[in-house]
């Protein structure tokens, strides 16, 4: 039989204050600092909105990490807190005890709410915010500096989530007093006019990750370019399934030139991902030459590129230190792979991930990339499935990986000799050929996680993943 621990005196004191909201409100200014967190959590869990409104006005810490306490925003709770902040921001003389500089609506730091009471006697909590956002990303702190509200935003639908809509309206009405800082912004299906409205409210210099999906490239470039130019702290930029409906190559070139000029301002960019790359076919160099910062991650996927596009990849210093290169499902079977081989040689000392899945590379092209690939000593992940390889070409490829001792996950296609007229695997032929390939590989090194053939495996259902220790079908 377990004995439940008696409530702490602090908990009892907080519960006593909350029984009479008028008493708790009048006591806020003189409330001991050590009581503030437990009392706030109690008021929050019981939804004592009036108490929350007053508590936020005398908040004794620099940050209120509400997002880690409220996983999903609750409209009435949000209104209560913002009402308290409104009353505070409109006062000429702010309370002596008030220290709040950041309202954080992200799920950042659960430890904040678990460390009371002792740790808070000396803490003013600047640490959590600095881990996710540096001081240069948002306006400088100081007396009567704008209050910063941090939130990660995902725009999925119209009408918008009512909490987000209320927050946008609240911030817009207090321009100059509040900055809405969004470190990560994702736009799924929201029409471009609503995305523009959001960008007019968000403090653009705070955005570190931006993902835009399912938009027209011409409209995106014309309507959003002016906003992208102001995102000077952008680290990750993703365009997914953005399409185009023009066959005018000259017009495309002008649009790409306008779009590329944006990158002259993005001095901190580390990741660039474009899914459906065809819009840039024949114009990729315009974009690459405008990159100011050496990228760590480049993903250009789905579609096709010309040989001139591939050549530019090895010619600019911004791509000289890549750690991750993904060209999956970019059709490469009609062009020379010598430029790709030159790029691999250039980035051999830094490259950790190489994804050439589904590029329809023919075994006659393979020799162009093998010297560069064999020098990628830091490579841990190599995806080469869904390419057109003979058994001899695959053996040659595997032998060239002998020096890749850090390789921990790799995929290869079934040799073409094992495919039937419908380009499906004939398992009677494939099984001994796969054993032959594994024997060739084990002669030069011991693999860790390897897939040869179709994925997911029809025999065991497994797919490439970091969790899979061994593909038993090999």
UniProtKB/Swiss-Prot annotation:
InterPro entries: LRR_dom_sf, PRAME, PRAME_domain. One of its GO terms (cellular component) is cytoplasm. GO terms for molecular function: ubiquitin-like ligase-substrate adaptor activity. Signal peptide: none annotated. LRR repeats lie at residues 97-124, 179-203, 204-230, 231-265, 266-291, 292-323, 324-342, 348-375, 376-400. SUPFAM superfamilies: RNI-like (SSF52047). Gene3D superfamilies: Ribonuclease Inhibitor. One of its GO terms (biological process) is proteasome-mediated ubiquitin-dependent protein catabolic process. Keywords: Leucine-rich repeat, Repeat. Belongs to the PRAME family. This is PRAME family member 1.
């Amino acid at each position: 039989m377990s004995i439940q621990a008696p409530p702490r005196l602090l908990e009892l004191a907080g519960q006593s204050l909350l029984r009479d909201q008028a008493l708790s409100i009048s006591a806020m200014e003189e409330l001991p600092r050590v009581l503030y967190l437990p009392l706030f959590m109690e008021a929050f869990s019981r939804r004592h909105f009036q108490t929350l409104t007053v508590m936020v006005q005398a908040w004794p810490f620099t940050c209120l990490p509400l997002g880690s306490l409220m996983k999903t925003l609750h409209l009435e709770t949000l209104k209560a807190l913002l009402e308290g902040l409104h009353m505070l921001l409109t006062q000429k003389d702010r309370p002596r005890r008030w220290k709040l500089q950041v309202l954080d609506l992200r799920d950042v730091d659960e430890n904040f709410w678990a460390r009371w009471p002792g740790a808070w006697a000396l803490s003013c909590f600047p640490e959590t915010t600095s881990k996710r956002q540096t001081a240069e990303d948002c306006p400088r702190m100081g007396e009567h500096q704008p209050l910063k509200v941090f939130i990660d935003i995902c725009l999925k639908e119209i009408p918008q989530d009512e909490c987000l809509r209320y927050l946008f309206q609240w911030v817009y009405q207090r321009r100059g007093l509040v900055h809405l800082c969004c470190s990560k912004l994702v736009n799924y299906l929201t029409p471009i006019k609503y995305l523009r409205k959001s960008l007019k409210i968000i403090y653009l210099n705070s955005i570190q990750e931006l993902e835009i999906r399912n938009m027209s490239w011409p409209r995106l470039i014309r309507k959003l370019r002016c906003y992208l130019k102001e995102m000077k702290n952008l680290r990750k930029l993703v365009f997914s399934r953005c399409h185009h409906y023009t066959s005018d190559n000259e017009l495309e070139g002008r649009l790409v030139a306008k779009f590329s000029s944006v990158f002259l301002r993005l001095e901190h960019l580390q990741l660039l991902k474009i899914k459906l790359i065809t819009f840039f076919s024949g114009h990729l160099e315009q974009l690459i030459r405008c990159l100011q910062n050496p990228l760590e991650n480049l993903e250009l996927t789905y579609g096709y590129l010309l040989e001139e596009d591939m050549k530019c990849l090895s010619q600019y210093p911004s791509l000289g230190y890549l750690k991750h290169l993904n060209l999956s499902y970019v059709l490469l079977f009609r062009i020379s792979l010598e430029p790709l081989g030159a790029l691999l040689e250039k980035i051999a000392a830094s490259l950790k991930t190489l994804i050439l899945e589904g590029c329809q590379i023919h075994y006659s092209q393979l020799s162009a990339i093998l010297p560069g690939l064999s020098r990628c000593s830091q490579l841990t992940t190599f995806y080469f499935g869904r390419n057109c390889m003979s058994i001899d070409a695959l053996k040659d490829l595997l032998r060239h990986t002998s020096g890749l001792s850090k390789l921990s996950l790799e995929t290869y296609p079934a040799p073409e000799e094992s495919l039937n007229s419908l380009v499906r695997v004939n398992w009677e032929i494939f099984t001994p050929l796969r054993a032959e390939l594994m024997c060739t590989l084990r002669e030069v090194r011991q693999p860790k996680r390897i897939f040869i053939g179709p994925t997911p495996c029809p025999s065991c259902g497994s797919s490439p993943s970091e969790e899979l220790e061994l593909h038993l079908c090999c």
